[in-house]
């Protein structure tokens, strides 16, 4: 893909250089627009590392190569999903998902658990691009399929504010020095130094703004030009089997709708595929001509599963697929999903609030609380060595089948204000043992290590 030359900040990127970057970047341009700024003559070999850091071209390429060459199918990095309400002084911000990162490996079932309102469903919807994410990136097969630019825009805003403040401080400093100067030569030197400092401040701010604008253009390009084939390989099973199906459409129309959107208009072939999907999920051909209200909750969920599977997905996001079903039906749906996973080689993200279900269905589990991942580990490790107080609280809520044990079961109440002191030492997601991550600060990390011993 060809590129136009770009003027930006400290660099004069000629067409030859940009073509090299384009070749290395595998066809993901950072844009054709440019800012009119003062050019400084720098040699390509001397400034190549600066260009990497400035535009994030090769780090992104490196990450893509790492993902393609590994078994990581989906990679979520620093995902933030905020919702805004009101306007002006009454504008409020809801942090549904706050800076989470995780990988999903090929063939595994990755569980996301937590109480209602913790952000697990929003995470799934953000991955599948039902929401425009606020900040962060989602990589699928090494390609960035979704990204947010709010942080970049805030950085531009704060850079402009810092520039004004710094120039104001320089001006006040100049006035003070001029008042103390005794000769015209000293005043001339003070004014020259002031102009030089102001120029440096503006140049530095201009470079930062140029960098962030380039990243914003890259994000817009990635969001707009994501290959449709990649997006189609990610499908979702929604939580409510009633509201997720159009009551005015027949089952056949519901299931084949995705095929028609993608340009498959051969009714005979589509009907054949619909029948195959119905049989896969335990329904029969006669059900294709019926409407959703004629089915039970479990059958409606099977229709939702068939609708997702007909697109031949590689990654299936299951958003609490059994929470709205009767207990007698839940086991059937879980067994069906497990069989489909084995038969079709699916990778799954299983969202639930019931740890007892996730334990037997998922390979790894991420526990979410108030938009953050507080613990992430394999299923066996999480149930054997739960460390975070919130994880312990969730596990203590699992009912016991033995009535005698159930009577004596001790519930653990999680109170963040009592369990943590983050006033000075701020927390982050840290690896305490291989594959086991905890959201904690330094002091808590040491305590958790002692607890494991």
Predicted feature descriptions by range:
Residues 1-72, 86, 90, 146, ...:
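Charged, flexible cofactor/metal-binding loops and thiol motifs
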Residues 136-147, 201-204, 210-218, 228-230:
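Conserved ABC transporter NBD signature motif
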Residues 310-314, 330:
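A short, proline-enriched helix->beta-strand linker immediately N-terminal to the Walker B motif
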Residues 358-360:
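A short, surface-exposed alpha-helical micro-motif characterized by mixed small hydrophobic
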